[in-house]
Amino acid sequence: MVRMNVLADALKCINNAEKRGKRQVLLRPCSKVIIKFLTVMMKHGYIGEFEIVEDHRAGKIVVNLTGRLNKCGVISPRFDAPINDIEKWTNNLLPSRQFGYVVLTTSGGIMDHEEARRKHLGGKILGFFF
């Protein structure tokens, strides 16, 4: 079967494993976008460490789960989010102002909405987690 959206598949696997109470989840294939998204999630403590397993094909990622993640998902298509519209997107996607992050891809790399606001960057919305 052909994978249409690798990031969506990976986040759905993480979501399902978290709901089942698993401690680890195996994601394949590996991509740079998935690694950067997981790095943002790890920086905020929603997942534990993750390890990239190179198998001379597409690669795999083993993610350690902490049980803190409620939901994560992809926004498809990747809508444009100028700096002044990021607030509107966070209100639509996140349950409250206190927690959760919207992940954007900007000219400065993949980052959460707070870092993008600090750096005064807009971009395209990849997904969210809380």
Swiss-Prot record:
Q: What is one term from the GO cellular component aspect held by the record?
A: cytosolic small ribosomal subunit
Ribosomal protein as a keyword?
yes
Indicate yes or no for the key word Ribosomal protein.
yes
GO MF annotation, one: structural constituent of ribosome
Q: What is the effect of changing residue 6 to I?
A: In strain: LA79
Pfam families linked to this entry: Ribosomal_S8
Q: Name one GO biological process term.
A: cytoplasmic translation
Q: What UniProt keywords are attached to this protein's entry? A: Ribonucleoprotein, Ribosomal protein
Give the source's domain of life in one word: Eukaryota
Please report which protein family the annotation says this sequence is part of. Answer: Belongs to the universal ribosomal protein uS8 family.
Stated name of the protein = Small ribosomal subunit protein uS8B
